[in-house]
């Protein structure tokens, strides 16, 4: 009887498999990839870093957890090139790859000295994905890209990162890099490899961006939208919000909105998951409130919320130099300056129910263009790691300015050039002369 039962059980299991299917045991052997430069993250900083390193001749691998590059522009949907130009004169202060991307998106001339807005927008975030894809493909043979790939572990020896472990459709993959550039936004590689960092117990709120179609353009739309959200909040349908920014950016009857405010810890998986769900809930609550109370939305429909909620702040490495508010506001100059910033100190309050988008008075915290030194991209304790983007070394106040789109691109380009220079000269990034990095950037227009 037992044998018959086992036979029937096996037969039933076999019948559940498609014709010709076989059971496969996963191989224990990992795929191993050796590369000169590993760029972790394909957002604004990471895309610029990967392009800069590969264009400078280094064999480069960029890994990104999304199925496309562009980070806050494409995954979060923020189309602004914040930090590219002086707020009053509109003079372009960041050139290099950032200006190249803006020009190739059709927003300005490639040799622009001044632009119409200090924070111009690109016309189409999907086409920005295509632009990055095309630029990556132009570096074929020098640049490999792995999308849908998560960094999940690091191995260090004698102050060097020797291996980085990825998880993707190949299983667990071991990467053996000579230089690593952490552009993860959250300093994941730096933190897991043991580099010192800091993270405030309460960070800036997370924001989901979304779009609504078939909206009538009326002069009082922003005022009415704000009044409707007050009613929704009073009814318990919307916990926090700011603004909101209701902007006709992409089409004459379509609005793009950022006004959601979700307090959360973006380096805690469970809390980040909660924030993603809360953001979607809040976006639809806003839409319902406007449909109910604002005539311009009578025939409107919800187009989409972008895939990821936007993160403003998480870990910041403690580097060889910690860039401070005073450095920015005093316009302090550095011999090893490798990037320029010009955005105001933009610190969003975490838990206020309504109100403005900044804990600072922007009139009092608008610096002139300022230097970002190479040392603020260098973490302590690890010789072959560079960090670029919003997780670089800065105080919380300075980071409120340096975290934005174009400043991240400028840091990423500098890190990519530095990584290639380190490979070429056989010198660890930690031992590179920052002035040499600056000279190398000048040669490529960065």
Task: Please report, for each region that a protein language model flagged, where it lies by residue.
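Flavin (FAD/FMN)-binding glycine-rich loop and adjacent Rossmann-like elements that form
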Residues: 72, 147-148, 167, 172-179, ...
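N-terminal Rossmann-fold NAD(P) dinucleotide-binding loop
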Residues: 46
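Aromatic pocket-lining residues of Rossmann-like dinucleotide-binding sites
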Residues: 53
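Beta1/beta-strand and adjacent pyrophosphate-binding region of the FAD-binding site
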Residues: 32-43
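Bacterial Sec-dependent signal peptides at the C-terminal "C-region" and cleavage site
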Residues: 16-30
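Conserved N-terminal/central alpha/beta ligand/cofactor-binding core
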Residues: 58-59, 64-153, 207
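N-terminal secretory signal peptides and thylakoid transit peptides that target proteins
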Residues: 1-15
